[in-house]
């Protein structure tokens, strides 16, 4: 969700594919064939960034992108016009211009990013070991358990965290399906449940995807920090742990049926 917030500041779209470098690159090709201008891709590990015309992740390219962000600062043209540097431009578009300073550091940059609490991919709680090799069947059972959980917990989730609705989304290859009504359709692809507040703004999600090579499910949770107060940070941290635990327990229950 952080990426969507950043993209919105620049009035650009985010398109998502299933996990895997090939899926991301193929989706970009499909979009270009539809006359989209796709400048940057991402696949979440090992340097992540894929910058057109490259078709693979390149950590060195990512490092140089960070250096450009730090080094390209405001420039005054001969005609007196000021061309904003990359970070200054970001601060302006994101409503954080008051946080800009000329001699900024990478720490200053991170402070302007939308704040979320996200499960770390290398954390032990981000991996579950399952027995059911039929992921469609597992997710079908998970759907029944999740819908029961929602009916039991929706009042609590609204009172504590302002959650009023949810939507299931799946990614299979280069295809994304929103408003999923049958979780089993996601098969071995990624399945995400996005939670919304009363204004229909996304404030958290849970996600899972089974490994194609081992009996493991990768899971994660993402929770928006609503403001800069310490209370909001603490509450979001606690909710990420709570929501991921609910999610993991529902998967385990579905695997045991």
Residue ranges of predicted features:
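Phosphate-binding and adjacent anionic-ligand microenvironments
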Residues: 1-222, 226-257
